[in-house]
């Protein structure tokens, strides 16, 4: 194709993504669009087609973004090339959303006709507006008995400020309104800008590792053209590779002769080293490089940290390789090696949130077959020492001694909770119990309220989301943003078994709850840790001060069983001998700590505050 033909083709390209709150019907709408455009034959069709990971299907959530090319013949008789980029809806995967939106010109905003606007809907709309996307509102699930499309239309206009007069009323499940949506994409979403004759600039928005072909890059071509045989260069590190294959997803990978401006597809170039590619990097041609890199993505900082250790220590290298492969298409995952006296060699990993942590753990266990121990999650604290230094600490075992600490600051988040009016009391009570400060509250409509609190991230990390869902019967929706660091009365609590600190059980706690929490965890550990041949004291300590203690009684053999009658001194001698043996055993004995003990540090949070 000459550049004139390519420019004509470019005018027919539409890149868009679908954004919505969890469960508002995003993946179902994507399925219907694939069916309508006959991208997938009815034989291959299955629900949630784009959610290719087993984990996504089981949980019914989208974790990874997906990019697909479809052809659609519009009412004007022209055939258009659509690139649909599917996005996750959960707060932990906002980074995935921001990446997919950067590869688009338009976004379909799906809102449930019964539930209306939710916290995540808002968060994702603001991301789309930041990227200057054309937003097409779609009111979905209009066939539900509780649907009220007019109310939702007003909500979209009042809360988000979008013109919803032309919002499509649809039901993805029943296939209503799909054609209208496709026509609106043709009319309203702008064609990609960019110059096919300019030097190549392609934005990497995802990548996967293939055992045979190396790292496969998923790219959006912003300027220029790329073909097999070209020599490409990464703009961040200057490394060059020879392109072996380019193509698109339909959802299966299909090879093509070229990818030109506006296209979304994949590039394989025998890239063997995972570290050579980074999501957000710009690909250009080695012999005709672009002047500057594209405006990439902002680097996401992990909010939650936890230790990951293989149960079998010989799996350490396998775990490292697995984490590197996961990091390829999940750029927000960070990790570095660490050792623990209790658990051996492992990694300190940073995650965007608890669901992210959960998903990574499950993917490691499923896809790479590695059994893991996870330590309790913690956040990044700013510890100011007496010699006026400030250290960032994400691992409780690295906390300086209490005598060196001047004060500690912890991260607060701005939590936005949307909830029906009748549950406002429950939400406020929960937020206050989690040390939250009330900011503001406003009514979205007659029944729904938007409550904003400043809450310490450490309190949200535990089980805030579960507690919020259970106290509002699942009606609340929740979104949070990092706010600021504030001074707090925090202390590090150590757990001692048989007089030895177990570093992996240490945690940071607010002074006010320290005694209660110490007491609860000691009692929990007493139930979990099996009895030994000797008595084991379990202690919770802040610095040198013991705040709680409980003893696991020793298992003991009845040494008097064979003494029928006889002298009391004989019995005493046997008992003394047993006692001396137990004492010797206690001095050299070590206590095995089961996996549940580490998890109990997590789950004890709520019992402390009942």
Swiss-Prot record:
Topological category with respect to the lipid bilayer: Peripheral membrane protein
Location within or outside the cell: Cell membrane
Protein's UniProt keywords contain Secreted: no
Keywords from the UniProt entry: Cell membrane, GTP-binding, Hydrolase, Membrane, Nucleotide-binding, Protein biosynthesis
Catalytic activity as recorded in UniProt: GTP + H2O = GDP + phosphate + H(+)
GO CC aspect terms: plasma membrane
Domain called tr-type G: residue spans: 11-193
Record-listed E.C. numbers: 3.6.5.n1
InterPro entries: EF-4, EFG_II, EFG_III/V, EFG_V-like, EFTu-like_2, G_TR_CS, LepA_C_sf, LepA_CTD
Keyword Cell membrane: yes
Pfam families recorded: EFG_C, EFG_III, GTP_EFTU, GTP_EFTU_D2, LepA_C
Gene Ontology annotations of biological process type: positive regulation of translation
Enzyme class: hydrolase
SMART domains registered for this protein in UniProt: EFG_C (SM00838)
Functional note: Required for accurate and efficient protein synthesis under certain stress conditions. May act as a fidelity factor of the translation reaction, by catalyzing a one-codon backward translocation of tRNAs on improperly translocated ribosomes. Back-translocation proceeds from a post-translocation (POST) complex to a pre-translocation (PRE) complex, thus giving elongation factor G a second chance to translocate the tRNAs correctly. Binds to ribosomes in a GTP-dependent manner.
Name used for this protein in its record: Elongation factor 4
Source organism per UniProt: Streptococcus pyogenes serotype M6 (strain ATCC BAA-946 / MGAS10394)
